[in-house]
Amino acid sequence: MTRFAGPVFVAAGLRTPFGRGGGALSAYDAVSLSVPVVKAMAAQAEPDLLVWGTVIPNMGWSNIARETWLDAKLSPTVPAFSVVLACSTSMTATFAAAGMLGGGTELTMVGGSEVMSRPQIALTADASKRLTDLFASDPAAALGALQALTPRDYLLPTKGWANRITGRTMGDHMEETAKAWQVTREAQDDWALKSHQRAVAGWERGFFDDLVIPLPELARDANPSADTSPERLAALKPVFDRDSGTGSLTAGNSSPITDGAAGCWVATKAGLARLPTGTPYARLVDYEVSAVDFHTEGLLMAPAYGIPRLLARNRLSFADIGLWEIHEAFAAQVLANV
């Protein structure tokens, strides 16, 4: 089956290397880090539409897609809009673009960017109102009040990456899920070790050479480590549950704060023909968007609900799929979901 009026294809794009938070790419913001990807992809073909996303809010723009496209000095007549859905933002961009194909839109560029090194500092509602009122009535007094702001007048929009509803981070939630599903520390470390080994092997054999755009500050991913070993992983202490004695998520089996940008193509058959010969592609047949009550079911457990529904709708089983790619924020998350 397919949910689309005609065949839809996803074709390989490009990305930056992924840098560690506070590391080589921390001087970028989400727009400037997106520009090299968008420019390089646009050199292959000009899309009919750009759909781009980012999660961490920025007060400097409201439409990262349009800002990126124009900063890349590309045609101002190409429309662009932004999406956001937490860690699924770029995937959501793909689904949104797929639903807009046809009627002259044959080739779309989709993707996203995140610079977790640079969450913007904002003012509290009280401080913001105080300054806004002063600027309207007495600009000189407002400047004085601005200089007199104290730490309690500021806040991070992400509040230390915590969920707004629960006040807990993804790691806090995942620690609870790992306990609930009895995902052991050993299983997590084993999965993390394999992930490091596979990523390093991919770089060594040149798999990423035509997928990653080297930047002046960073040429390859900073996170995969060739010297990761079972012993080194086992020696790490829990980072989210440090007190109970049963914490299992560590810096070794959890993904770090990361900076990067990535894009791909979503196209009709006619759109594919506009890409360079030999561009890898796959057909997008269907998709599923799911949500959970993260007070009781775990913040990162939506795939456990979405995957069975998607398979059932297409009369497939888990074993029928030859390759699964599941967002690996934590080793425990993948293990709990599958």
Model-derived features: where do they sit?
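Active-site-proximal alpha-helical scaffold in enzymes
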Residues: V84-E114, A178-F207, G263-G271, V338
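Conserved catalytic cysteine-centered active-site region
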Residues: Y28, T54-L107, I165-T169, D227-P256
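Conserved active-site "lid/cap" helical segment
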Residues: T2-A72, P76-P79, C87, T169, ...
